Amino acid sequence: VGNQILNSLRWTTGSGVAVNEINPSSFQPIPPFLGEKIPAVSPVEFRNSGFTEAHLRNTYYEGYFLSSNITHHIAQCLDQDSRLVYAYYDGIDKVGHIHGTGHFYDAEIALVDYLIGQIYKILPSGTALIVTSDHGMVDVGDSVIEINDSLMQRINTISGEARFLWFHPARGNHESLLRDLQDLYGNCAWVRTKDQILDEGWFGRQISDQAKERLGEIALLARDPVAFLDKENPGPKLVGRHGSLTETEVYVPLITSFKE
């Protein structure tokens, strides 16, 4: 955004919290839930964050402290005749990042299965329950590739995340950077220019000029179970990661049930 990299989850830049400098409502201008004001049951620590303002603004925010509270918050919303209730739980994502998709992950999925069952029990007749996810998870572990030093010397900055990096080349380095990225990483990743991605409609048919300006010039997307990191700023060490366009990451469940 401008000449700074925004961490949208924390709503921070290199200068710190950026809520005042980067207005969440301007950054993400589409009204959530088609402008309808509904209850949003989500972790209490996310209340009033920049990211929450961007995607859940104008909701009745019902912050929960523990997963055991979620069902009761939803029940309270339904008792108030809410036509639609949104609820978010981040346990599977956290466990996947920390432990990968092994026994810990399976245990968390079992917990979520129980939670969904409890939610279904308190639904009034004539209510639909829809369960989905925002992404999958890939076990990367120690399969980390540090970006080549010669590449880093030809860029202004990197944005994105470890499985979907955007390179912002310094002036005059676009062609050589594109060629070398393809040569070095084409065996385990997709390399695409911004123009290719926009022409192929990766982000939909209509992209605002403001959104286009946030993109880098060249994208590097992991195809294999690897992560690409800047060794000067590697970020947290994670076992499970997501962000690329493999089937494991983009195909998510959609489970629906109607309470008669």
Outline where the language-model segments fall.
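Feature captures the catalytic ectodomains and active-site-proximal regions of enzymes
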Residues: 1-260
